[in-house]
Amino acid sequence: MKYGQIKPITTVHPDIRLAPSYTRKAVMAGMRLLAPLYLRLGLRFSSVTSLHAERAAGAFESFFSGKNRLLIAFRHPYGDEPQLLSYYILCRVRKDAAEAGIRMTRDPHALFIHGYEVPRWGGAFLRWLLPRMGALPVHHAKTDAAGLNRIRKAISDGQYPVALSPEGQVSYSPRSIPRIEQGAARIALWCAEDLRKAGRPEKVLILPVCFRYIPVTRSGHSAEKLLNLVENAVGTLSDSAGPTTDSPRSAGS
């Protein structure tokens, strides 16, 4: 399909089958090596700055020491927040902990909750990667008892914290929150109830994470290409001209 053409979807694909979720240390080690390159070359971020990093480091330390269970709730206004947060957890939390004088006993990681539609449009590599990183799939459009039970067990007994977006999907609203689903609060309450029934002393912490994107320079070429695509699709033409090069972004979390 050539650039500027939009092909309608006329077929229905069968539901996908994912491997059982189980973290592979070799895969995680590989992702720690590749994540900085992907962030720079794939997502085009020039730098990542973390604010109040000692809070995240302290939350992970309390989880690994058995004092608390941890649920990470992150804003999802665009499409690359899960990748950005995964990079930060894999590659930066331990360094930030050392700078804050916090001793981290294990390599940080998090189990991300995702909809079944993500590996469907994400391609074969993502379908291979997500289960091996311990990601937790769930159906959004129908009742998924098996998926919810899997999440409930992970937050109560898993070896890593659980991460999800309270917005439920990409919100396309970086400056405001259009809505918040009940998932994060409900999962935290489930965990607290399970801990109480089991007589366990841990508390449940919710770590909120937000993102701010700062363009290093004006990056108008990508917007220009998207505008041309839309105009071609609806049969209009534009005489506007924009920059011809993309520029990296920086992000704060």
What do the PLM-derived regions correspond to, one by one?
Residues 8-14, 23, 27-253:
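Soluble catalytic domains of membrane acyltransferases
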